[in-house]
Amino acid sequence: MVDEQVAVEHGTVSHTISREEDGVVHERRVLASGERVEVFYKAPAPRPREGRASTFHDFTVPAAAAVPGPEPEPEPHPAMPIHANGGGETKTNTQDQNQNQTTRARTNAKAEERTAEMDDTMASSGGQRGAPISADLLSLSSLTGRMAAMAPSWMKSEVCGERMRFKEDVYDGEAETLAEPPRCFMLSFVFIYYCCYLAFLALLAFGFNPLFLPSFMPVGAKVLRGKGRDFGVPLSYGCPTNPFCKVYTLIPAVVINNVTYYPNNTDSLGGHGGFEAAALHVAALFESGCPNLQAVTNRNRTFNVTRASGRVERRLVQDMQRVLASAVVVMHHHCHYETYYVFDGVGPEFGTIPTPSFKDVLAFRPSLVTNCTAPLKTSVKGPNWSGAAGGMKRKQCRVDRLTDRSFPAYLEEVMYVMVQ
């Protein structure tokens, strides 16, 4: 379909022919000077109202075809001198050169006049009759349109002249509501990423750092010491400061003749040593079946050790035998304190010590009298607890022992073994 329009603007008569199938506008303009000019350009697409980017097609107009005019006349060849017959006048090429320069000046003046009139006509129409006829501008508009068409849905924009306006800046109620970029998701992802990164650094700095590994490790078999020497220095090689006084040792104290012998080699009279001899005395009486052994639990229940009949009482007696025998082995061989904790190891590959019994520890003193009323022989001396171990007080050991029920949830344990 072809639309024809005739308009008179400022003395300029324009005849416009537009084709809807391709949007090309063909204008034939008659200037005030009487000269006819033909102009071809492509009408701009209407501004989209649904929020979609405009799509442009390539359409370039050669600069020579934008404002066609009379072709410049070819420059005449230099005229050859003509000699008149009979010695007439001679015509030089100076006159021809002057004539060519005059013609060229007139042509340039007409071209400048046509260009000025075209600019005035486009300015008076407000730029609404068509897009700029420059080939460079048309190519730039086509490139801008393709870029807008390839953008994501949330970045779709409207092209307004030479400026691309994103949908975030458009406040048009009729425009399509486009999805916003997931800013909250991106921020949360970055936050979680950095938290995991910091946790990984902390794990490397502390969890896998050998300087922060626990000092306790299975020491293998017995770490023997020469007799008369001190035990290992507390806190070195994993030695606890209060040996056998922690809740997880569960080593009962031994009461003989109203004197209490504590697992840290102290007694209620303020003396040092004697716990190994007291434990061996209890082992000898138990193996002889003496009825004068009484056990006191943390629940203030008292029962006979050799005549225990209930399920709980038998379990308490077995635990009492195990821990007393283990303590005697550690003290007799001058082992490090932590050796006590590897009696129940995972296997022989770690060099663990088999859990001893009363019969095993009685082999240390085969001449021990098995009389139930025999007094305690203190000839067996414990190791020297002077120096770093001197700060271990009976009161502290008595308070710490079996008062914390958090490891593990023991129901009842033997706190004292009394020889009556």
From Swiss-Prot:
Start and end residues of each stretch annotated as Disordered: 1-21, 64-129
Domain of life assignment: Viruses
Chain ranges on the Virion surface side, renumbered to this chain: 206-420
Glycosylation sites: 258, 264, 300, 304, 371, 384
Main localization, broad class: virion
Cysteines engaged in disulfide bonds, as pairs: none
Entry's transmembrane regions: 185-205
Localization (cell): Virion membrane
Role summary: Rearranges cellular actin to increase intercellular contacts and thereby promote virus cell-to-cell spreading. Induce the outgrowth of long, branched plasma membrane fronds to create intercellular network for virion traffic. The fronds are actin based and RhoA-dependent.
Family that this chain belongs to: Belongs to the herpesviridae BDLF2 family.
Domains: entry comment: Plasma membrane remodeling is mediated by the cytoplasmic tail.
Name under which the protein is recorded: Protein BDLF2
Species of origin: Epstein-Barr virus (strain GD1) (HHV-4)
